[in-house]
Design a protein with these regions (language model features):
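Conserved donor-binding/catalytic core segment of Leloir-type glycosyltransferases
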Residues: 195-231
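Short donor-sugar binding/catalytic loops of nucleotide-sugar-dependent glycosyltransferases
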Residues: 12-13, 207-211, 236
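Active-site donor-binding segments of glycosyltransferases and PAPS-dependent sulfotransferases
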Residues: 29-100
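Active-site proximal beta-strand in glycosyltransferases
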Residues: 90-93, 104-135, 183
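A short beta-strand/loop micro-motif in the catalytic core of glycosyltransferases
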Residues: 92, 158-167, 231
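Membrane-proximal helix-turn-helix segments that form the acceptor-binding/catalytic region
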Residues: 130-163, 171
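Nucleotide-activated donor-binding/catalytic signature segment of Leloir-type glycosyltransferases, i.e.
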Residues: 240-248
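Acidic anion/phosphate-binding donor-loop and adjacent secondary structure
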Residues: 172, 176, 183, 188-202
Length: 248
């Protein structure tokens, strides 16, 4: 594999979170590898990624993408399958949605580093699509769409030679839903960014993306009951809903 042509595949580049931190490390390891991603919001990534060759799918030109990219979920499998990876000997995908479903050349090696199987299709389906989150029309169209996504998700497993998981929990999910074993490789950690402090505050701190699967609502409910202070740092689509629950 010394002279192998390498491609990196990542679901999408819309902000800087855990998956993108891992992709940043992959980009350092393979400095010449282009990045294939469904869509990219320019300026949303660190310079190491922004300066790379980034190849996007047809979704990049869809209307209202920046504010409503989740609307295009039914097209994600098709978009990743249309990436032409025939010139690459080694595919390294960073996947929490459809990146693992990229189609490699028959003799190419495909390793997928999985942050989680598709949460809203499997273990977190009801966190995303509970009845109180869906309107009349959505309650009729979402279940069959997610059913199709599950079918594709399982079918595309054969395109991956080896799975790696970012934790033992994710490795168990991979086996539960995919019946594939995954080796655990923990994500890189910047141990110099934070230093222990002798000062102690009078509140708890929660730092997270404000998305359904993080279950910030449970933490808010707990602190509403116990009377202790908690500060929440983060952004995401659940911001208004959670702020209302926190009486902030």
């Amino acid at each position: 594999m010394e002279n192998a042509k390498v491609a990196l595949v990542h679901d999408w580049l819309t902000g800087q979170r855990g998956g993108e931190k891992v992709l940043e490390v992959f980009a350092e390891i393979f400095p010449d590898a282009p990045i294939f991603t469904l869509f990219h919001f320019p300026g949303s990534q660190v310079e190491k990624i922004e300066e790379r060759i980034i190849k996007t799918s047809f979704l990049q030109k869809m209307p209202f993408l920046q504010k409503r990219y989740r609307w295009y979920l039914p097209f994600f499998p098709l978009a990743v399958e249309l990436f032409d990876l025939q010139e690459f000997d080694f595919i390294l995908s960073s996947s929490h949605c459809v990146a693992k479903g990229a189609i490699p050349r028959p003799d190419a090696l495909h390793i997928s580093y999985v942050h989680s199987p598709v949460r809203y299709a499997w273990n977190q389906y009801f966190a995303y699509f509970s009845p109180d989150r869906l309107g009349f029309f959505s309650r009729r169209i979402v279940p069959p769409l997610i059913h199709r996504l599950r079918q594709w998700d399982v079918m595309s497993l054969t395109r991956v030679d080896h799975f790696f998981a970012n934790s033992k929990t994710v490795a168990r999910r991979i086996y539960r839903y995919y019946r594939r074993k995954a080796e655990v490789v923990y994500p890189p950690v910047d141990t110099e960014l934070f230093q222990p402090s002798d000062r102690q505050g009078d509140y708890y701190l929660l730092v997270s993306a404000l998305v359904p699967y993080k279950r910030i609502d449970l933490a808010i409910a707990a602190f509403n009951r116990n009377g202790l202070k908690m500060k929440i740092v983060g952004m995401g689509p659940d911001h208004k809903k959670l702020k209302k629950e926190a009486h902030a």
